[in-house]
């Protein structure tokens, strides 16, 4: 892992400490914008407080960012724990990071994804499926059909591992011999490794479920698919509605 990858992890991962005040997506976006134009040699060394001040940050913010970057022992310990649980980081500057996320989400792409499973699946063409947890019978059949058809056409299925539409489509795809990328909103480390299934989570591998994590991962589900199928959604509220409306607003991928 090179210095830039370590830097992304130190700035964006809680490293097992829920009280660690990491950079938000907006703060990471601002830092990336301010870092543009810096020489490669500057990007490969550890940032100092003066570097952050020269980028336009006040002294308090510069001290906070430097404190995050100094947690190297905690990072090494966290990486070691992750390896034992078969969880590995893919930062926005890593070779394995999906280019389609950089292309579609640009500065809003996650600083780090944690992965469990076959990373080569990340480079395969995919479609996505989202939908409600409580499904009507006809919509459950639709979700299963999307999963089956993805496998039949050699496309990876991207979904969110929630009960209902997500798992229905995922299981149909796997049963048909297809590949699945499942972006979870709970503890990645507790997911059982399965053939043709790659689990991903944002920021860390041991974070508990939260509504914020569930909503945040929706942009990745929508952006990874060349098309997104919506099995069912409540009108005006809920995660499926929120993610789909944002996709339509920002044009990450076509919605069907």
Residue ranges of predicted features:
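Short, small/acidic-rich helices and loops at N termini and domain boundaries
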Residues: 1-94
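Glycine-biased, small-residue-rich flexible motifs in mid-sequence functional cores and linkers
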Residues: 1-22, 44, 85, 92-256
């Amino acid at each position: 892992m090179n210095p830039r990858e370590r830097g992304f992890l130190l700035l964006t991962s809680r490293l097992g400490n829920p009280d660690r005040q990491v950079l938000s997506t907006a703060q990471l976006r601002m830092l990336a914008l301010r870092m543009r134009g810096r020489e490669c040699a500057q990007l490969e060394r550890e940032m100092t407080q003066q570097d952050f001040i020269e980028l336009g940050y006040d002294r308090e913010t510069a001290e906070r960012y430097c404190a995050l970057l100094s947690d190297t022992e905690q990072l090494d310990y966290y990486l070691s724990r992750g390896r034992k649980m078969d969880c590995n980081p893919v930062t926005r500057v890593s070779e394995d990071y999906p280019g389609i996320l950089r292309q579609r989400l640009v500065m809003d792409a996650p600083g780090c994804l944690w992965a469990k499973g076959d990373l080569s699946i990340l480079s395969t063409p995919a479609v996505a499926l989202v939908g409600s947890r409580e499904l009507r019978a006809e919509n459950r059949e639709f979700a299963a059909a999307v999963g089956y058809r993805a496998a039949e056409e050699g496309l990876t299925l991207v979904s969110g591992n929630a009960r209902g539409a997500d798992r229905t489509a995922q299981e149909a795809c796997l049963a048909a011999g297809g590949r699945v990328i499942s972006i979870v909103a709970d503890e990645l480390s507790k997911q059982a490794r399965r053939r043709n299934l790659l689990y991903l989570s944002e920021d860390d591998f041991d974070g508990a479920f939260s509504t914020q994590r569930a909503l945040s991962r929706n942009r990745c589900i929508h952006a990874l698919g060349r098309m997104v199928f919506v099995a069912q959604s409540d009108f005006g509220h809920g995660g499926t509605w929120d993610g789909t409306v944002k996709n339509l607003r920002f044009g990450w991928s076509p919605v069907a």
